């Protein structure tokens, strides 16, 4: 199979996917190495295909951000140590919240944003396992723990309840500072 055919099939596969697809799975499906898939994704992005990488795999951007219009969407500003990240995510998910992303405002690079796509406890476990396995550091380590999350909730009252619970455990950054 030629590279252009593989990339066309890759876009079709991502278009049909309802969940993120890991590069290793795609590599196995197409009979190439993981690194070839990573390169294909880079080439497709340069060709104006909006593919995002989450900690769970690749996803087309329109699928990642398709949110029911009846749900409330807002941003929260948090500050915590790395060992409090699971508590933060658990509070949000236990209320029925969906953590779309994390953002930090780096003094040199400006806004750095990463897709999370965390909807349930299993996603939190996967995130935690991936961080442990890679010995990775939180993006917020660049900004003294300060970061933002875009979250989607069933309604505004749920969003406010999440904020109250995060504030109660000292994770929500005090808006009066």
What kind of region is each of these model predictions?
Residues 20-53:
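N-terminal helix-turn-helix
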Residues 8, 12, 39-42, 90, ...:
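Solvent-exposed alpha-helical segments within well-ordered globular domains of core cellular machineries
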Residues 65-68:
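Basic helix-turn-helix/winged-helix DNA-binding cores
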Residues 24, 54-55, 102, 176:
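Residue-level detector of family-conserved "landmark" positions at structurally sensitive sites
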Residues 70-177:
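Mid-protein regulatory/catalytic core that forms ligand/cofactor-binding pockets
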Residues 51-62:
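Minor-groove-contacting beta-hairpin "wing" of winged helix-turn-helix DNA-binding domains
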Residues 1-28:
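Extreme N-terminal segment that seeds HTH/winged-HTH DNA-binding domains in transcriptional regulators
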Residues 28, 58, 106-107:
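Conserved beta-strand edge residues that scaffold enzyme active sites
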């Amino acid at each position: 199979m030629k590279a252009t055919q593989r990339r066309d099939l890759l876009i079709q596969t991502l278009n049909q996917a309802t969940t993120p697809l890991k590069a290793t799975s795609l590599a196995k499906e197409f009979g190439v190495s993981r690194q070839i898939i990573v390169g294909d994704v880079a080439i497709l992005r340069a060709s104006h295909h909006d593919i995002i990488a989450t900690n769970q795999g690749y996803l087309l951007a329109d699928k990642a951000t398709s949110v029911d219009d009846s749900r409330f969407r807002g941003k929260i500003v948090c500050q915590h140590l790395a060992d409090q990240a699971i508590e933060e995510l658990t509070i949000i998910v236990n209320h029925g919240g969906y953590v779309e992303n994390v953002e930090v405002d780096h003094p040199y690079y400006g806004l750095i944003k990463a897709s999370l796509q965390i909807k349930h406890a299993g996603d939190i476990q996967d995130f935690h396992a991936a961080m442990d396995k890679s010995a990775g550091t939180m993006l917020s380590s660049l900004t003294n723990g300060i970061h933002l999350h875009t979250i989607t909730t069933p309604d505004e009252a749920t969003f406010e309840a999440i904020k109250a619970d995060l504030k109660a455990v000292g994770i929500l950054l005090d808006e009066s500072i």
